[in-house]
């Protein structure tokens, strides 16, 4: 393990240029403490510069990294950073880096990097490894065992760059690509790709050369055949032979024409079947479309134009609606302003009239409220008269009761939340298991589909190979027979002893020349009979070969045909039986296709309905939340509360305000009557000197009269009326605010009852969609299996046709053999009978001449036969070699198909196991959810009960506080207002509000109409498109019916059978002509000069053609194999990169989750993770390339969101620290070093403590491994206390400024912090 030991800093930033400062790094913890600006971060900058050679941000120019020369009064300052470290194998190194800052005459500063060094210390010996800067950067990274990207972004991350995990996507991708060293592996793949492309170009050249060499090889073979043919030609029979050849060519052309005509009729038959299937499909599509569309009478062109213009129409309607909505909002603002003015005027109208009466009424109301509240909340001792002291005591007691209820509710909510969290965790665990099973199931399904595609490709390649075991056996049988014929021909040539016989006959010929003519005629006749017998032998041989070929074919494909047709199948009925089975399989494939298409259509409809339901649910949820916020805002404004009350209290609050307003208005009416009454008392006392109530005389009782007048004067004041009017205005304003949102409250209540039912519908549609997906997957599987079987049967179809053709050929050959036997059995006169009519001499002459001719011809024939058989043997050997190669390739393909089928079965078993696991998990999840709902309802009931008690007490306290404050305010208010001006203003405002409301109602009607048109647009658009599709299908159906009728009228089957029969007849005639030509060619002699010319040409140009072709063919095949190997190698590297990346990301995210959950103290984020999204790009020359896009996301429950732009500054700091710790854990296997610079920035006290405890746990866990070097740089000594640093180190380093304001490093005891 590598580690750093000491760091020396000289002339860097605030460190002086004359005396170096040194710091030693300990294991497992090194602490660096200092106030802001003391130079702590410079330590990290120097470590990073020493290891990577990179300067801090914004310090690459103008010498910002070097000590300012002006501070020391010098023109030049040299900075030096030395780092002592040990490599991964324990070697001791010292890296030194030097940098210079020079101030020139024009005060321009020049920064220059000087030569550094890497020193190896080994047993007292000091060896300089390198002094070049570029080599230093590479060597230090290698010796530490850490890539430069990890040193830069993880281990020695600068404070300015510490939040890089929260940077924008492009910068984040660049960081992670450097960390994963993606460019190295990308370059490897690119090199392999270029090499593969180069080999592909070479393959093209080799294939062209192969074609040329093959042509030369075929040309050489052709020359061989021509040379063999020339040896058998006879000049006397050339014209006749040419005539026969011409006749044969004419017959071949006729046969070819017949087969081509038959194939054209066969194509018509296939077209008829294809069009019939398409017609059935079109009919089904027409019925399905007709069931769901509303037919439109407009022409197609009008519908297409309407469809094209639909988007413009909708945009125009939306713009019109938005314009009217803007007008509505403007009117609404004007109406709100008018209402506010009206409310203010109405409040001012009655305020001064109700002050005094309200004051007295509120005194009575307060006593009544206290008695009622005491009785309601069981507070004893408040049934009698109440004075101010007892009222104050009551307020204190009820406030204490309210505080107790609040604490009780908080405790209950905390306990309930803990219970719900435990049950939610159970559900989350099972849901996680379910998602894992679903992912496994999807992977297995994808594997099945992939294997199916591979099998289809392999099956297509297999179908292209016409060679089978039967063909090989047939070729080997031909070779064996040909070898026997060669040996027999050679034996006949040796055993004949023809030279001696010819010599003996030549001695007799001169004696018997007179008898040669008659003997020659007899020989011609005998030769004709011999020809007939030879033709009979040829036909018997052909018949035997075709029977043997039929036997080989039936034995080879017996297993496949037995599987399809049963064990008792016969070649005679094979074509009809196989055609029936093939048609049944085609019908089965069609049925599976129809079912799959129907289910797919049903799935599309289900997805459309589910999407609509979800959109509606989201829309209604947003509307409900908006209504709830509006109602809560109005309640908060009406009561002037700090926080919004529950929306369910709206009706209670509205009824309370209405009741209070009625009471205030009643008090105002009573106030006027009381004022009249007190005016009468005052008038009587002044006029008649008597009390109006008791009729007491005030003569000689001036004191009593004065007291009465003073009391009446107080009653006649306007203060109480003023308070009543203010109360009236306040209640009216509150009621206006609450009544303005009554519609939204009703909407909220309605949506609260509708949304659960809509959620259940969404769940039902979701389950239906999942059922349809599973059904469609099963139907896809059944369709692929049936289609694969159909392809296998179609592959066998050519063998069926070949067996059928062999049966017909055998039948025709048997008939020809029978006719030849009849011709050869015709009786002719024998040689003895001829000799009886001739003289003995003539007969002997003819016999000798015939014998000489026969011996000569036999000698030449045997030579030609041996040569011809040798040529045929070479050709047959090449055919056998090619057949063996193709059979081996075919065997490899069949084995590959078998492996793919086995893999498919394993994947199907995995899908079945996943389905069983899902069926088991669904009831468990449902049970857990039911338990959670039941617990939630029970908890909610308990909380509601305590909350109701708290709210009742809170309402009492609120009402008492309100009435007490109003009573106190009455003592400070006074002064009437003018009513007339207020009434005129109110009338004008009411007229204005009525006009505005009318305009708003008209705009609302128009906007609703436009919204309805927009909502119905999608359905209309889809209906128009379906109408066009429906009409197109009708036209195509009519066209197909006409085409089918035309094809059926052509009677293609009868013409096909007739043409095949005529072709067989022509083949028989051609066979006869061929037999005649072969007989004549056997009599031809070889032209020696032509033979020599061909032989010279062969020796000069074509002698090595076969070897050259073989060499080129080997190069082509080896190059193909190399290209395939390069492709597999490239795929293997790509797969290894994917696996490595997935493994590392999983390890990093696991570490991040553990650190976050043990550190973060908030409840808004459960965990964070790094997401790497794979993006594949395809190009024509480089294939598919993968890129990774990274982002940091936060998770709460089942919700995942991007963290960038959504989290606080403290969460950014904490997340960045945790991500760096996780990256160091994963990528620093050879170096347990990491530095944290001011890790507590922007963190609150709870998270600071938690981070300290987590770091303590990490150090403790890694301490035993001996490879951890954690460097913590901070100004927060409380944070170090929480870390309990004394467990890991005895001292720390303090960075501070000396008297010259230079930074110095001082070593101090850890007890300075912990005490």
Curated annotation (Swiss-Prot):
Necessary cofactors: Zn(2+)
Name of the encoding gene: RAD50
Residues binding Zn(2+), per UniProt: 691, 694
Domain observations: The zinc-hook, which separates the large intramolecular coiled coil regions, contains 2 Cys residues that coordinate one molecule of zinc with the help of the 2 Cys residues of the zinc-hook of another RAD50 molecule, thereby forming a V-shaped homodimer. The two heads of the homodimer, which constitute the ATP-binding domain, interact with the MRE11 homodimer.
Domain DH: 722-928
Oligomeric form and interacting partners: Component of the MRN complex composed of two heterodimers RAD50 and MRE11 associated with a single NBS1.
Occurrences of domain Zinc-hook (ranges): 644-743
Entry-linked InterPro entries: DH_dom, P-loop_NTPase, Rad50/SbcC_AAA, Rad50_eukaryotes
Keyword Hydrolase: yes
Main location: nucleus
Coiled coil start-end: 220-261, 321-429, 472-553, 589-674, 748-952, 979-1115
Enzyme type, top EC level: hydrolase
Location within or outside the cell: Nucleus; Chromosome
UniProt similarity note: Belongs to the SMC family. RAD50 subfamily.
Annotated EC: 3.6.-.-
Protein name: DNA repair protein RAD50
Organism: Chaetomium thermophilum (strain DSM 1495 / CBS 144.50 / IMI 039719)
Pfam families for this protein: AAA_23, SbcC_Walker_B
Keywords: Chromosome, Coiled coil, DNA damage, DNA repair, Hydrolase, Metal-binding, Nucleus, Zinc
UniProt-listed GO biological process terms: chromosome organization involved in meiotic cell cycle; double-strand break repair; telomere maintenance via recombination; telomere maintenance via telomerase
């Amino acid at each position: 393990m590598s580690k750093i030991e000491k760091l020396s800093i000289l002339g860097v930033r605030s460190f002086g240029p004359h005396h170096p400062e040194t710091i030693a790094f300990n294991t497992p913890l090194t602490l660096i403490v200092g106030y802001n600006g003391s130079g702590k971060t410079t330590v990290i900058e120097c470590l990073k510069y020493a290891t990577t050679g990179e300067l801090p941000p914004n310090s690459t120019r103008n010498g910002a990294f070097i000590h300012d020369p002006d501070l020391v009064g010098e023109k030049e300052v040299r900075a030096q950073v030395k780092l002592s470290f040990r490599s991964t194998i324990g070697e001791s190194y010292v890296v030194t880096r030097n940098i210079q800052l020079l101030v020139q005459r024009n005060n321009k500063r020049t920064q220059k990097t000087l030569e550094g060094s890497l020193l190896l210390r080994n047993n007292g010996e000091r060896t300089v490894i390198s002094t070049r800067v570029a080599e230093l950067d590479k060597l230090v990274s290698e010796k530490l065992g850490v890539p430069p990207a990890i040193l830069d972004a993880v281990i020695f991350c600068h404070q300015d760059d510490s939040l890089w995990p929260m940077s924008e996507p492009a910068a984040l991708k660049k960081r992670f690509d450097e960390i994963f060293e993606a460019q190295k592996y990308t370059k490897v793949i690119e090199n392999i790709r270029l090499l593969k492309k180069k080999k592909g170009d070479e393959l093209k050249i080799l294939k062209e050369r192969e074609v040329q060499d093959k042509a030369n090889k075929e040309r050489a073979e052709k020359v061989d055949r021509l040379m063999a043919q020339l040896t058998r030609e006879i000049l006397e029979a050339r014209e006749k032979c040419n005539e026969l050849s011409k006749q044969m060519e004419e017959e071949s052309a006729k046969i070819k024409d017949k087969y081509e005509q038959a194939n054209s009729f066969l194509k018509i038959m296939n077209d008829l079947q294809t069009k019939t299937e398409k017609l059935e499909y079109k009919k089904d599509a027409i019925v399905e479309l007709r069931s769901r569309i509303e037919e439109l009478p407009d022409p197609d062109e009008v519908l297409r134009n309407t469809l094209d213009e639909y988007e413009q129409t909708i945009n125009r309607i939306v713009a019109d609606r938005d314009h009217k909505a803007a007008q509505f909002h403007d009117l609404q603002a004007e109406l709100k302003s008018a209402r506010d003015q009206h409310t203010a005027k109405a409040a001012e109208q009655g305020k001064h009239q109700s002050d005094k009466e309200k004051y007295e009424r509120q005194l009575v109301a307060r006593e009544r409220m206290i008695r009622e509240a005491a009785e309601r909340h069981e507070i004893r001792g408040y049934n009698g008269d109440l004075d101010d002291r007892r009222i104050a005591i009551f307020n204190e007691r009820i406030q204490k009761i309210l505080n107790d209820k609040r604490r009780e509710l908080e405790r209950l909510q905390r306990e309930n939340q803990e219970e719900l969290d435990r049950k939610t965790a159970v559900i989350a665990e099972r849901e996680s298991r379910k998602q894992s099973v679903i992912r496994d199931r999807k992977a297995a399904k994808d594997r099945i589909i992939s294997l199916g595609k591979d099998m289809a490709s392999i099956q297509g390649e297999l179908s292209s190979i016409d060679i089978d075991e039967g063909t090989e056996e047939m070729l080997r049988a031909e070779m064996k027979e040909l070898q026997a014929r060669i040996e027999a021909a050679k034996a006949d040539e040796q055993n004949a002893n023809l030279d001696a016989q010819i010599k003996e006959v030549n001695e007799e010929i001169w004696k018997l020349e007179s008898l040669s003519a008659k003997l020659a005629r007899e020989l011609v006749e005998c030769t004709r009979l011999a020809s007939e017998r030879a033709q009979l032998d040829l036909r018997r041989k052909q018949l035997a070969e075709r029977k043997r070929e039929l036997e080989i074919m039936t034995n080879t494909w017996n297993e496949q045909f037995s599987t399809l047709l049963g064990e008792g199948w016969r070649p005679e009925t094979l074509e009809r039986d196989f055609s029936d089975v093939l048609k049944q399989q085609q019908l089965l494939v069609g049925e599976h296709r129809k079912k799959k298409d129907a289910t797919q259509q049903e799935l599309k409809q289900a997805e459309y309905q589910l999407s609509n339901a979800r959109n509606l649910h989201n829309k209604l949820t947003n509307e409900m939340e908006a209504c709830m916020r509006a109602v809560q805002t109005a309640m908060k404004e009406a009561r002037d509360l700090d926080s919004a009350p529950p929306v369910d209290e709206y009706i209670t609050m509205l009824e309370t305000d209405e009741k209070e307003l009625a009471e205030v208005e009643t008090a105002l009416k009573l106030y006027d009557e009381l004022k009249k009454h007190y005016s009468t008392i005052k008038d009587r006392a002044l006029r008649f000197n008597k009390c109006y109530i008791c009729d007491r005389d005030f003569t000689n009782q001036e004191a009593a009269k004065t007291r009465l007048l003073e009391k009446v004067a107080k009653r006649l004041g306007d203060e109480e009326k003023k308070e009543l009017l203010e109360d009236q205005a306040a209640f009216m304003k509150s009621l206006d605010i609450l009544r303005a949102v009554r519609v939204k409250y009703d909407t909220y209540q309605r949506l609260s009852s509708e949304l659960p039912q809509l959620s259940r519908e969404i769940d039902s549609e979701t389950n239906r969609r999942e059922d349809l997906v599973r059904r469609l997957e099963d139907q896809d599987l059944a369709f692929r299996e049936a289609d694969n079987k159909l392809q296998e049967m179609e592959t066998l179809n050519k063998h069926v046709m070949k067996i059928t053709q062999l049966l017909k050929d055998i039948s025709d050959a048997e008939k020809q053999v029978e006719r030849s036997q009849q011709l050869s059995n015709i009786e002719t006169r024998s040689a003895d009978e001829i000799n009886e009519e001739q003289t003995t001499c003539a007969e002997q002459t003819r016999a000798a001449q015939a014998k000489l001719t026969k011996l000569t011809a036999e000698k030449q024939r045997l030579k030609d036969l041996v040569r011809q058989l040798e040529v045929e043997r070479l050709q047959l050997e090449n055919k056998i070699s090619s057949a063996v190669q193709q059979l081996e390739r075919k065997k490899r393909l069949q084995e590959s198909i078998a492996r793919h089928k086995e893999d498919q079965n394993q994947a199907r078993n995995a899908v079945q196991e996943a389905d069983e696991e899902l069926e088991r998990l669904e009831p468990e999840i449902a049970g857990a959810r039911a338990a959670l709902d039941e617990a939630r309802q029970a908890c909610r009931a308990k909380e509601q009960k305590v909350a109701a008690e708290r709210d009742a007490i809170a309402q009492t306290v609120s009402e008492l506080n309100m009435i007490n404050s109003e009573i106190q305010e009455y003592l400070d208010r006074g002064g009437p207002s003018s009513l007339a001006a207020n009434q005129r203003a109110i009338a004008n405002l009411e007229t204005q509000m009525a006009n505005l409301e009318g305009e708003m109602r008209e705009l609302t009607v128009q906007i609703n109409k436009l919204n309805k048109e927009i909502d119905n647009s999608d359905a209309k658009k889809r209906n128009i498109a379906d109408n066009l599709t429906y009409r197109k299908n009708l036209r195509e159906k009519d066209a197909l019916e006409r085409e089918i009728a035309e094809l059926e009228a052509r009677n293609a089957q009868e013409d096909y059978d007739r043409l095949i029969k005529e072709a067989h007849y022509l083949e028989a005639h051609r066979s006869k002509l061929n037999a005649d030509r072969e007989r004549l060619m056997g009599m031809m002699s070889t032209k020696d000069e032509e033979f020599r010319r061909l032989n010279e040409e062969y020796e000069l140009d074509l002698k090595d053609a076969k070897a050259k072709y073989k060499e080129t063919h080997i190069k082509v095949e080896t190059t193909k194999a190399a290209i395939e190997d390069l492709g597999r190698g490239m795929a293997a590297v790509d797969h290894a990169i994917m696996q490595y990346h997935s493994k590392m990301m999983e390890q990093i995210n696991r570490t991040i989750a553990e650190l976050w959950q043990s550190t973060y103290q908030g409840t808004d984020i459960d965990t964070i993770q790094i997401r790497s999204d794979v993006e594949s790009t395809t190009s024509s020359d480089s294939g598919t390339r993968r890129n990774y896009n990274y982002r940091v996301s936060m998770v709460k429950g089942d919700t995942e969101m991007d963290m960038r732009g959504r989290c606080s500054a403290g969460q950014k700091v904490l997340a960045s620290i945790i991500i760096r710790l996780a990256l160091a854990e994963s990528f620093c296997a050879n170096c347990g070093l990491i530095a944290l610079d001011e890790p507590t920035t922007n963190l609150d006290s709870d998270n600071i403590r938690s981070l300290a405890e987590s770091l303590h746990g990490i150090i403790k866990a890694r301490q035993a491994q001996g490879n951890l070097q954690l460097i913590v740089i901070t100004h927060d000594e409380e944070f170090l206390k929480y870390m309990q640093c004394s467990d890991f180190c005895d001292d720390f380093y303090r960075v501070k400024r000396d008297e010259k304001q230079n930074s110095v490093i001082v070593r101090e005891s850890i007890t300075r912090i912990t005490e």
